């Protein structure tokens, strides 16, 4: 007897943990000026992969929970709420393009690679645009920081997300191809 809900929840937890580990231990901090650092990491690859395999709800929650916990435990507590929202949107964007626009589940191998690449690039573009805006609004309206500081932080965030997007998309496509014939042939979640 197979319980798909338990399998789905287990995979979501695994992807959240992988995103957490990538942020916590595999990030590269780059000085960006103004006393700020940009964080470059491949954790988005696991959010993308979760959204492709598990669909919108679990994929979006995977990224939101995994990277929000990483922020909290790494000492970036005030970054956790914007991280939750922006990573949730990243997962939703990837799942929407892959499953609603292109119907990834019905695609053959060659077409699936194109769909995965397009969905991953679209999701990362959404993240590069929305995350700086969310962080700017949060810093100005919730934390009460001056506009100039919030603006510099948003620019820093946009650059970090754009640079992180490239290896994340590449890794997500390769990982999807690797698990396509194992996990995906055994379990259909979407």
PLM regions with names:
Residues 1-190:
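Loop-helix junctions at membrane interfaces
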């Amino acid at each position: 007897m197979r319980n798909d809900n338990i399998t789905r929840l287990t995979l979501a937890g695994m992807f959240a943990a992988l995103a957490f580990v990538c942020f916590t231990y595999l990030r590269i901090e780059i000085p960006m000026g103004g006393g700020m650092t940009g964080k470059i990491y491949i954790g988005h690859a696991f959010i993308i992969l979760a959204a492709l395999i598990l669909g919108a709800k679990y994929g979006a929650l995977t990224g939101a929970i995994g990277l929000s916990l990483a922020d909290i435990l790494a000492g970036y507590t005030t970054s956790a709420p914007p991280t939750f929202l922006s990573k949730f949107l990243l997962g939703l964007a990837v799942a929407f393009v892959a499953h609603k626009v292109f119907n990834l589940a019905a695609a053959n191998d060659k077409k699936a690679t194109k769909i995965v690449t397009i969905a991953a690039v679209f999701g990362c573009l959404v993240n590069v645009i929305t995350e700086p805006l969310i962080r700017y609004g949060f810093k100005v309206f919730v934390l009460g920081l001056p506009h100039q500081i919030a603006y510099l932080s948003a620019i820093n965030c946009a650059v970090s997300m754009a640079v992180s997007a490239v290896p994340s998309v590449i890794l997500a496509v390769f990982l999807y191809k690797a698990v396509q014939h194992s996990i995906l042939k055994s379990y259909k979640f979407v």
